[in-house]
Swiss-Prot record:
MF terms in GO: nutrient reservoir activity
Lineage: Eukaryota, Viridiplantae, Streptophyta, Embryophyta, Tracheophyta
Cupin type-1 domain ranges (all copies): 154-303, 350-513
UniProt region (Disordered), positions on chain: 119-145, 308-345, 424-452
The protein, known as: Vicilin
Keyword flag Glycoprotein: yes
Family listed: Belongs to the 7S seed storage protein family.
Sugar-bearing residue positions: N130
Position of the signal peptide: 1-24
UniProt feature, compositional bias: Low complexity: 424-433
Amino acid sequence: MVISKSPFIVLIFSLLLSFALLCSGVSAYGRKQYERDPRQQYEQCQRRCESEATEEREQEQCEQRCEREYKEQQRQQEEELQRQYQQCQGRCQEQQQGQREQQQCQRKCWEQYKEQERGEHENYHNHKKNRSEEEEGQQRNNPYYFPKRRSFQTRFRDEEGNFKILQRFAENSPPLKGINDYRLAMFEANPNTFILPHHCDAEAIYFVTNGKGTITFVTHENKESYNVQRGTVVSVPAGSTVYVVSQDNQEKLTIAVLALPVNSPGKYELFFPAGNNKPESYYGAFSYEVLETVFNTQREKLEEILEEQRGQKRQQGQQGMFRKAKPEQIRAISQQATSPRHRGGERLAINLLSQSPVYSNQNGRFFEACPEDFSQFQNMDVAVSAFKLNQGAIFVPHYNSKATFVVFVTDGYGYAQMACPHLSRQSQGSQSGRQDRREQEEESEEETFGEFQQVKAPLSPGDVFVAPAGHAVTFFASKDQPLNAVAFGLNAQNNQRIFLAGRPFFLNHKQNTNVIKFTVKASAY
């Protein structure tokens, strides 16, 4: 039997059905988008990079590819959202319904579109935040590793160079409080650049890691000036006025600086006699009366000089401690300098890489200057070292009897591995319940005595790794690139280096891979 229906009822029913199908289509699209959430795909891609990549460089390239794919998926999803929104509006206009119903339909399309767009933006910011927190957590879990991009603080920067300083060693790494008085810093100057004269309240050792230049420093007694290149090490007494010139026409001059402050432990400052911006001249802190007397100059002349500096400051803007040097200026400074000695002596500069290597074979070389043989390093009780590992080579496991070594990577990629008892105690201590803090520490030490945890860190240019005294450590280069590093041994007087695997000191991955396998839980060290 056929039942007759009112045309009006049929029309209303058709409109309601169309509107429901339209809204369900938008909702289904939303579900489809979240089912293939780019953020989830990005996280899966990152996990694959971490598990499948065998080298640090390979992992970085993989992660960059994940980032590009994620952004491309975001762009495509945004375009798809726009297309679906326009289709939704078009269907609303095509329906034969009143203006009010049509506006409700279009408003529903707009709300769905904005909700999904807002969700995608939140996902993007959340995944960036989570990634940053993950990197910070990795550094907290490895207090001996200081990655370049998170650990250095820039003190001075302009167009011609920069000066940056590593965070204090024990700032986030309590096991390193024994070396917290030392600071590591970096100068980087463009070709043909002059670094303004300055002095600092710290003993310092300058290690040239790249480029060519001239380092000059003046004390109250004499003046020392050296033409330097990669491998040159210069000891600079506290309070010496230092100025540096980058001579090369192509390469930047980079210098690693180890400083031992003489005022506040772990804190030192640079003082500039001349400057018109950042840095400022320390003469500006003195009154005209003092300057008139000291320089035997009338106040009008001093005001003229200071006003001229203020004018330069306004004209030159951000010009700072790094200035472009003229060729004749560079020649004049370099002609007055001498070359460092190859061997020990009273002079304050040597070329470490010109010495005979302490260890050497076809897989790598290791150079070292100890305070027993080089008197200029005795004040700071520091040894300076450098090593080069060929592709796939291993610096076999060893430990130092007294010295803690701060290793700075200059070129190439690789890894460091170390056996650490401190992290083993921390990991077990963090898992225990709420006990008295002192009892917890005592129990943790008793339970983990003689147990070790493996510390592993990827190494790339600019990274820093610290190997404390007594900790067995090894370094190995990636399979496709050599690994170059310089190191400062702190508390190095009468230090001995003990190799766990005997000779040879450098191996290739193919020769013997067993030497890098640490036992992370052992009954004896």
